[in-house]
């Protein structure tokens, strides 16, 4: 007997970026192969007129709730927003990642992965003097030890390239992170370098930063507005950024409240320069606080900027699954995959979206969470669904 039948829904084929009206069967926590004859399932969910997706993936947010001032609660920011898989964006380094793993990661309802911060203490608070980015203090020996201990959970190394962290170090922290990553990749670990790009100091340029990135590495906050941005004075995309994307560097919107503007999103959509990934970059002080407070809200803002629904949904399903190296367990709805499922309503809207600078955009599509299923179990459901 099947456990669950989700019927009549428009199922998102994330690899193709298309919808298909079909039923989904779930058995023992996995998506099941339909048979010609079958017994009536225990639970039937009628998704007529709704959209059935792989559980959404929030590839960059901060979830060290018990050990960091910036850590959000994964159970309140993920599950109600149809997020079944999340990756912590480097909140912790070698000195405190085990605490984060034991206190939060293994306890959250969603499947949580993490980037390891190259700074030993990670990013524990929002203050003037932030994490230590002296490359001499990065401790590659301890980083390697943690990758051996948590090979399935750790998905890369995080380094913040911004005025607040770099001081006079210039490109040295990124160069050291790339060396550590290369050694771990040689040992068979999935270990891209994830760069927080924002308000670069004068001794680091967009050209230098993007030229250093390798295929599979990730640049977060690509639509940020401080200092040198990805846009040249004439509004075109910086050639180094364009070339990085073409050679396989992964570009992450990494939304947050402060790392984007409506004009930047509109300019990117107009130039067909969408990100590979959209993530929420939620931190504790931004949980459900406007101008943007969740992954679904970020999708709605991008829709208001003119992006197509199908491409946006790939940015929160198959694309981050590939970037994290977990496409064998997330981001796709097919038999044998875990039954991590999102059901949404995608409604027309006249809602006006605002950024932190006061810019506005009239809404297009609103992404409304109806049901979240993790491992075949309903973890969240709207009262009217």
Label every model-predicted segment:
Residues 47-107:
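Metal-associated gating/positioning segment near the N- to mid-region
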Residues 1-53:
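Histidine-rich, glycine-flanked metal-binding segment
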Residues 9, 29, 49, 60, ...:
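Divalent metal-coordination and catalytic microenvironments
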Residues 9, 338-385:
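C-terminal cap of metal-dependent C-N hydrolases
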Residues 81-87, 91-92, 107-135, 158-165:
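Metal-cofactor-binding active-site regions of metalloenzymes
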């Amino acid at each position: 007997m099947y456990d669950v039948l989700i019927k009549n829904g428009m199922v998102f084929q994330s690899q193709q970026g298309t919808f298909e009206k079909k039923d989904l069967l779930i058995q023992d926590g996995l998506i099941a192969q339909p048979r010609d004859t079958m017994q009536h399932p225990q639970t039937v969910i009628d998704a007529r007129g709704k959209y059935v997706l792989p559980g959404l993936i929030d590839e960059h947010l901060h979830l060290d709730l018990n050990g960091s001032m910036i850590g959000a609660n994964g159970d309140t920011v993920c599950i109600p927003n149809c997020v079944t898989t999340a990756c912590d964006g480097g909140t912790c380094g070698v000195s405190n990642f085990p605490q984060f793993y034991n206190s939060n990661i293994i306890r959250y309802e969603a499947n949580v992965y993490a980037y390891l911060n190259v700074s030993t203490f990670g990013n524990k608070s929002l203050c003037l003097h932030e994490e230590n980015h002296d490359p001499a203090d990065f401790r590659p020996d301890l980083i390697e030890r943690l990758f051996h201990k948590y090979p399935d959970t750790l998905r890369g190394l995080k380094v913040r390239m911004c005025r607040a962290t770099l001081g006079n170090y210039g490109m040295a922290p990124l160069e050291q992170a790339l060396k550590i990553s290369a050694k771990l990749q040689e040992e068979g670990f999935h270990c891209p370098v994830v760069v927080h790009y924002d308000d670069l100091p004068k001794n680091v340029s967009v050209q230098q930063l993007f030229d250093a990135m390798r295929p599979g590495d990730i640049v977060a906050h690509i639509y940020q507005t401080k200092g040198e941005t990805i846009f040249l004075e004439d509004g075109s995309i910086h050639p180094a950024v364009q070339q990085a994307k073409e050679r396989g560097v992964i570009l992450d919107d990494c939304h947050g409240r402060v790392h984007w503007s409506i004009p930047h999103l509109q300019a990117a959509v107009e130039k067909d320069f969408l990100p590979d990934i959209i993530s929420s970059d939620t931190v504790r002080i931004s949980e459900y606080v406007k101008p943007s407070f969740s992954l679904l809200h970020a999708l709605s803002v991008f829709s208001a900027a003119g992006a197509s629904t199908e491409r946006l949904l790939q940015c929160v399903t198959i694309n981050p699954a590939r970037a994290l190296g977990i496409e064998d367990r997330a981001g796709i709805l097919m038999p044998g995959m875990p039954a991590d499922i999102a059901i949404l309503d995608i409604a027309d809207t006249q809602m006006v979206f605002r950024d932190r600078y006061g810019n506005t955009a009239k809404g297009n599509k609103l992404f409304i969470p109806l049901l979240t299923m993790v491992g075949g179990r309903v973890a969240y459901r709207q009262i009217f669904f």
